[in-house]
Amino acid sequence: MNKLTDEFVLHGRDIEYDYYYTSHRRNEILETIYNAYNKLNIEPFKFVVLNEKSLKAYVTNKKDKKSNPTFTRMKTDHLSSLEDFLKQRIKPKGEINHNGVVGPQFDSDTVYSRHKTVKKVKLEDFKILKVIGRGSFGKVCLVEYLPTHETYAMKSLKKDILIEQEQIENTLLEKKILQTIDYPLLCCLVFCFQTEERIYFVMPFLSGGELFQHLRKFRTFSEEKVRFYGAQIALALEYLHKKGIIYRDLKPENILMDDQGYLKLADFGMAKKLGENEKAMSFCGTPEYLAPEIITMEGHDRMADWWSFGILLYEMLCGLPPFYMENVDKMYDMIKNSQVKFPKRINLSDNAKDIIQKLLEKNPKKRLGYKNGIEEIKKHPFFDKIDFKAVEERKVKAPFIPEVESDTDVQNFDEEFTNEEVGMSYIPKKNMEMIKKNQGMFKDFSN
């Protein structure tokens, strides 16, 4: 078997010729063969580990055997037992064993730990249980922290992609925001560490899954639910705004639910720190949630978040964002020029319509929240029945409790992700060379 790749070759005295395979589940396959072989044979199963770009040069094929029945290309010196191999958990760099335990690879650099008693964490401290999400720069997995057996969500970010897409600075800002926030309605950073290939953010695991999954299941929410969820999101946004942070990517996919039906805002990849009276000029976010001032690139601030909040309220009540169209250019034109319309099939209260219309005001200086932030939201009649302080302190019973059977239950996450194999993707040699050449760009993650 190859120490550098997923290759392995089956070779034996009684086998006509060698069998060559490549599989990310190699360890699992070999362990199965090992158990079956040892039941039928007295002599234990043996193997050879090679450090090669490819094992193809060591494969004895049909043509070789036909020319010379005793010929073999296989190296049979330095044979070892499979037990030794399985103990070592030899895997290609960046890979994870079939049972989810991360194999030895690089020394980890612990960048941040929220727990004062834990000074250092490394990849080997975590067992990967399930894939629960995927983003532009990597995947999110449910993991078990082996020293305490606690479950967390671990977001892995591939350094080669961060370099190629010039996202190192944004990722560093995301890390700084995650480690400084301390608020019950926001996902915070528990650990952060890096290896040669990746950066890892470890955060609380919220077993209720994305709000998006529940909205897709129920299609729309009642006004009671929307008031409860809206109050939490408004509080989370106001917390960020008071710290000079604009969120800029509000959508149901970035809102997570815990097992008690409460929400947390997650994923700060688009967030930005702004000074007083400063405006951001970049064009970023999810198209159907973009405020007009982002599309026109006239400069935006916290008011862009309140626009997105209005879009979110509409989507929760009506099932789709108000200006959604498959043609993005036409959608942008509608966002800039069209007034919001409400579907007749849904019986919305006047208060629900009014708050949405005031949040979706094209002029940010006339938009609800411009003068006095969340206080204007709280005072709107739509939220009359909500005690914001009680919601913040989790004293209000959630109108919906997600079904959760255990600490590792992932039924509330998309099966597209949870059915994936729990392995880290292979990073090509040329990309590894690029990472090594630019490793200095990640030094600030250790500060």
PLM regions: where:
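Conserved short submotifs of the Hanks-type protein kinase catalytic core
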Residues: 197-210
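Conserved N-lobe beta3->alphaC-helix segment of eukaryotic protein kinase catalytic domains
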Residues: 151, 156-182
